[in-house]
Amino acid sequence: MAFRLAVDCLGFENHPREAIDAVLEYWSYHQELEFILVGDEKTFDGLDYLPKNITKQLASSCIDMTDTPLTARRKVNNSMQKAINLVRDGAADVVISAGSSAVYASLTYDGFGKIHKDVKSAFMSYVPTANNDWFYFLDVGANKNFTGKELYFLGLMADIFVKKTTNKISPRIALLNIGTEIHKGFDYHQEGYQLLNEDKHLNFTGFIEPRFLLDGVCDILVADGYSGNLVLKSMEGTFKTIARLLKQGYKRNPLAGLFSLGILKRIAKRFDYKNNAGAVVIGLNKLALKTHGSADKQQFLSTIRLAHTSLKSDLINAIKSSLDNYEK
């Protein structure tokens, strides 16, 4: 099937060519895909030729990182809204943006609507672990506040995603907390724990502390968006610091670095967040993905790859079907 991907090329910290070059590279390996690049006239300066499956849509403004959902709505024909509208109107199957997280969460919610009345949308990212595996982490920043029931639905939707996109038939679900004891946390932690634990279709393993996350003890990590974003950014910062310290160590002792270089390169590549940059905006009636505001070509590539995987899994229809059964 020829999936159509709309890419907002404006509103992030780097040059739009980072997004465009990622699209061109990914398309070179998947020429059955169609891409719609959304930007202003300057975005496409010097871009004299595009393959027939890659088209341009012109916008007259972009969403800045300083914009709020309110100020964004005053920017007529902005690139983010235009890319979202392509999916809303059926001209594309998924939208990708590196723009403001708050604005993107708001505009996709307004444009696509919730997939279920009890669901709150979330950014779902994926994180490598020490045992050569991954876990999916949500919410990492779409919404600050969740009820226990909304946390339960995050676990339910992520369970569907993992079953559809991996070979895991019973993914382990954990709920982020400051301790593993049942009484720890706020009221919404207690309610979320109870609902996840009572659903016998889910493999819920209980609360988990942040220090155990990279040990590979869960496949899905559920959290409110405030806590989730703090933990994710802390991990990304830690990975960057370790990489910097290793480089400093090589300079001081090149011989020791030479003997360990192969192993350390593999570790650095695995935990480089640029290779794991995409987040699915889960809980909406249409498919949207978010990448970092500092995204470069590599981060856009990893986000496009995740978007393609999500499309092939027919994620939205799978979630809708499961939630319909929940009602029954």
UniProtKB/Swiss-Prot annotation:
The keyword Lipid metabolism applies. It catalyses: a fatty acyl-[ACP] + phosphate = an acyl phosphate + holo-[ACP]. GO terms for cellular component: cytoplasm. The keyword Nucleus does not apply. GO terms for molecular function: phosphate:acyl-[acyl carrier protein] acyltransferase activity. Its EC number is 2.3.1.274. InterPro entries: FA_synthesis (IPR003664), Phospholipid_synth_PlsX-like (IPR012281). It is found in: Cytoplasm. It is an enzyme of class 2 (transferase). GO terms for biological process: fatty acid biosynthetic process; phospholipid biosynthetic process. Keywords: Cytoplasm, Lipid biosynthesis, Lipid metabolism, Phospholipid biosynthesis, Phospholipid metabolism, Transferase. It comes from the Bacteria. Pathway: Lipid metabolism; phospholipid metabolism. Homodimer. Probably interacts with PlsY. Catalyzes the reversible formation of acyl-phosphate (acyl-PO(4)) from acyl-[acyl-carrier-protein] (acyl-ACP). This enzyme utilizes acyl-ACP as fatty acyl donor, but not acyl-CoA. Belongs to the PlsX family. This is Phosphate acyltransferase. It comes from Mycoplasma pneumoniae (strain ATCC 29342 / M129 / Subtype 1) (Mycoplasmoides pneumoniae). The gene is plsX.
